[in-house]
Amino acid sequence: MRWHHLFGLVFGIITFTWIFSGLMSMNPWKIFDSGAPKLNINAYQAGELDALHFPLSIQKALIAFQATGFYPRELEWQLLDGKGYYIGFDNNGQSRILAAETNATPFKQFAWQQLENAATRLMGASKPSASSILTDYDIYYYQRAAHTMTGHIEKRLPILRLEFDDAYSTWLHIDPYTGNVTKLDAYKRISRWLFAFLHSWDWVPLLNSRPLWDSLMIIFSAGGLMVSASGIIIGWRRLKRKLA
């Protein structure tokens, strides 16, 4: 009992936050669903993604990429402002963009103003209340190690963040290397704190201070294990006395 109380005093709050954040990961009662309408990607693209926007063949696109010393291993289609683009990725994860037209030259990223104009169309009557280019990670946009939670999602820098004055306080993150858009409304930002932060302590200064983060996670996990194990032992002893 004494050890259970001691471990509980030191690690009880951490253990509770992990239990609570684990519950939040299930989105109970859909509390993190804002009800906001889905993004109208066709409005962002100014058209529907189809082969008509890609008059340049894949073979010629590969030749154009390779002519600049870039050797793609994967190609994606992107439509922006009604114009087709090939997004090429090499075996190192680097990317280049090529307009799907004759005599086009590969380039690294879309223009910021082009992306902002296209993204604004997504939100209809709502206009950006703030626009910023992130060159460093922050509490809402950050990269995790590949083997950790959400680490498989690549978060490149810089990116464009647009904050809107709509009813859902929507933020858009636009990747200039691909033109891809992700949405983060007020409900998802709350989820970021109640689930992701409390569950993995993925605060950017901590993530940048490994192995400090690893050491804390090991200590917290061991403490939580001792609280749980000592509680099981106490419960088992009481059960034995009742059954005796």
Q: Language-model features: where?
A:
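Conserved histidines in hydrophobic membrane contexts and catalytic metal-binding motifs
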Residues: 1-244
